[in-house]
Amino acid sequence: MSARLKGRRRAAAALIDRAIGFAATDPDVTAMALVGSYARGTPRLASDVDLVFLTGDVEALLTPGRFEPLLGERERLVRARTWGPLHERRFRLRSGLHVELGIVPAAWASVDPVDPGTAGVVRGGLLTAHDPDGRLAALRDAVDASRPGDVL
């Protein structure tokens, strides 16, 4: 593994640790998960850190500057998109690391039924980082018990 990749992984690990603390202390965050390549344990140098924040108040988490305690003051928003219920905010940090925040209503993790898009995210790799009410664990269990293509 190159020194550059090791440095990128250290920066990502530090960001993930901060995200766990942020999620645990922000009253608007009901749960948080790491998804994608870092959740699968297969990040590459170009991989971004993908975090999904569940909330009862999506608009509160979309307020500009809301994630500054997590990302730092010098982050740069490079993309904002909406994918169904998921509001994507992609940032480039001063270190060069890209971070993709997905802000979703808590119902995104519903298991009755599981949304096919949500199931795809879970199958692509999901590690629960903050889940005080067990919502993400129940979602992961429901998806794990199914097969791709099943109606959940």
Where are the regions that the model predicts?
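Conserved NTP/Mg2+-binding pocket subregion across the NTase superfamily
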Residues: 1-8, 71-152
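Short, basic and Ser/Thr-rich N-terminal targeting/leader segments
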Residues: 28, 45-47, 85
